[in-house]
Design a protein with these regions (language model features):
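Catalytic cores of extracellular degradative/oxidative enzymes
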Residues: 2-116, 132, 151-155
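Extended, hydrophobic/aromatic-rich amphipathic alpha-helical segments that build helical scaffolds
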Residues: 2-8, 118-126, 143-153, 307
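Structured loops at beta-to-helix junctions and adjacent beta-edge loops in soluble globular domains
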Residues: 8, 171, 264-266
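Short, functionally important structural connectors and interaction interfaces within domains
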Residues: 10, 14, 177, 247-250, ...
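Short, glycine/acidic-rich hinge or "gate" loops at secondary-structure transitions
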Residues: 12-20, 138-141, 158-168, 206-210
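Carbohydrate-binding/catalytic loop surfaces
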Residues: 19-32, 80-108, 164-185, 232-250, ...
Length: 313
């Protein structure tokens, strides 16, 4: 893994894509693009914990490059406009991207829509400061991206009268299930973004107004809920005609509703009921999966504290 990342991601280059630098096909799977509903983020999960922070510079630069086209997407799809009065008013990206800064939903709106994908990318680059404590780099390169992302989501959220929550809408759990509002995937990513942005702003002693605004929104997001059979619910409402059985497709490869456990920080030993519900969810999903999905599962079990299960995977 270290070799693959070092070979695919160096300063001055693009970040690692789906096939890295080894693609030899004119028509590779998924165009050898950047999938930002798990794959691009996962490429960089080992970077900091294995002391390879320098390999993440291309990712930070790439995400920064998504901001300009992402502002157009935010204006066209979300009505959040950047102009001379609000020069950094918010950006968004979705499931697919390219070296040319594609930020629209992609080939098919149904699975291509992922309004919280950009929040997930920000989670990756925030880790650069968490591991290096490079305050100068946080101020110059990372925080401006985080700040503008939070600016977008604080305007994007709407009030759901049925649940009382502030929700993202519409939401689609990556490649799985129906379109709903305020699913666990998006709510948890936005919550983590707000939490991280507050920490960053505090470290830089800046943006007190933004800190206050998103601090008020965090408790209204309420991303994690336990279902009737003890699981972390993937969708807020799972008892209507859009749903079959438990998780719509038992054993589905994506486990997007557990991002609060890993790579997020919302489900921990300090939230024992949610931690137990995460175990129920993982056991129900099973161990069989694609290679990348197994990698996610072993990290989830490690966060739970079950090293033996991680080793088995």
């Amino acid at each position: 893994g270290r070799y693959l990342l070092i070979s695919s991601s160096r300063e001055g280059s693009l970040p690692a894509n789906l096939q890295g630098v080894w693609n030899n096909n004119n028509n590779p799977p998924w165009s050898s693009d950047y999938h930002i509903n798990v794959n691009l983020q996962m490429n960089y999960w080992p970077a900091y914990v294995t002391n390879m922070a320098e390999t993440t510079i291309p990712l930070v630069e790439y995400v920064d490059g998504l901001r300009e086209p992402g502002r157009v997407t935010a204006a066209e799809y979300a009505g959040i406009v950047t102009d001379e009065n609000n020069p950094e008013n918010g950006w968004m990206a979705h499931t697919q991207s390219t070296p040319f800064g594609w930020t629209c939903p992609g080939w098919d709106f149904y699975w291509g829509w992922s309004a919280a994908a950009s929040a997930w990318l920000v989670q990756n680059i925030w880790e650069h400061y968490e591991f290096t404590e490079d305050l100068k780099y946080l101020k110059s390169d990372i925080y401006p991206i985080m700040r503008e992302s939070s600016m977008f989501y604080k305007q994007w959220l709407i009030h759901d009268e049925n649940s009382g929550r502030m929700v993202s809408s519409p939401t689609y759990s990556p490649e799985h299930g129906p379109v709903t509002i305020g699913n666990t995937y998006e709510q948890s990513l936005i919550e983590q973004l707000f939490v991280d942005t507050i920490i960053a702003a505090n470290a830089l002693e800046t943006d007190s107004e933004l800190r206050d605004e998103i601090s008020e929104l965090i408790p209204k997001l309420s991303p994690h809920h336990i279902g009737e059979w003890g699981q972390i619910k993937e969708w807020y409402e799972e008892d209507n005609a859009d749903f079959n059985d438990k998780d719509v497709e038992k054993g589905h490869r994506h486990i997007s509703h557990l991002l609060g456990l890993y790579p997020g920080k919302a489900i921990t030993d300090e939230t024992p009921e949610l931690l137990e519900a995460a175990k129920v969810t993982l056991n129900d999903r099973g161990d069989e999966a694609t290679g990348w999905a197994k990698a996610h599962k072993l990290n989830l079990w490690a966060r739970i504290g079950d090293g033996n299960r991680s080793h088995k995977l």
